[in-house]
Amino acid sequence: GAGIFTAVLFAVGFLCSLPVLPWCPLLAAVNILLLIMYSTSFKRMPLLGNLCVAYLTGSVFLFGGMAAGPESFLLTAPLFLVTFLGILSREIVKDAEDIEEDSKSGAYTLPMLIGVRASAVTAFVCMTAAAAAAFIPAVHWGIFYAAGILAVDIYLLRISAKVLPCRTPEEVSASRTASYMKYGMVAAILVFFLSAAAVRLW
């Protein structure tokens, strides 16, 4: 059934990582273990599930950097940090929206533990940290990257701030913060891609 199919996918993914540099299979093994732990227990725990999702999403950049070598890893590590913090922020907002549904499913999320208001502040702090970290690659990618990511940062911070006055899951959902965050994250990835391509071409 689904378990066998998942196991096959895990095995294929790990085998595909073997021909790459030695650190890549290790990262693949860690990620597989985290995915298993997330699906069995972490996703029902406050913050731990959010951290797991944020790490796994950002680890795409870690894997790419490791595969390309030490110099590329130094460049992609800040992208991992930005992605980790941004996804963590959005995950917390989503949990604040879904308190009732999560409670029915037996999950115990961060907003249930500390409340909607404190969760909104935590999400905003994470996004602010992500926005600050997003300027680190400007050392390699220059002024045009800095200008592009500044525009994205302003958008994401304004969107993240919309959740700060919220006191209930209904207010968080009505703000549509989690949905609008996705657009900013897609824009950030586009800025990453275009900046990296421009540096290679020029």
Language-model features and meaning:
Residues G1-F14, T83-W141, S160-S173:
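Solvent-exposed interhelical
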Residues G1-S72, P78:
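Intramembrane alpha-helical segments
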Residues F5-L9, L51-M66, P111-V116, R176-F192:
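Small-residue-rich segments of transmembrane alpha-helices in multi-pass membrane proteins
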Residues A7-L15, A29, L33, Y55, ...:
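Generic alpha-helical transmembrane segments of integral inner-membrane proteins
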Residues L18-P22, T40-R44, G69-P70, D95, ...:
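Transmembrane helix-loop junctions in multipass membrane proteins, especially transporters and channels
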Residues I32-T40, G58-S59, L81-A96, V152-V163:
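Transmembrane alpha-helical segments that form the membrane-embedded catalytic/substrate-channel core
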Residues L74-G86, W141-G148:
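Alpha-helical transmembrane segments
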Residues V139-W202:
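Extended hydrophobic alpha-helices typical of membrane-associated regions
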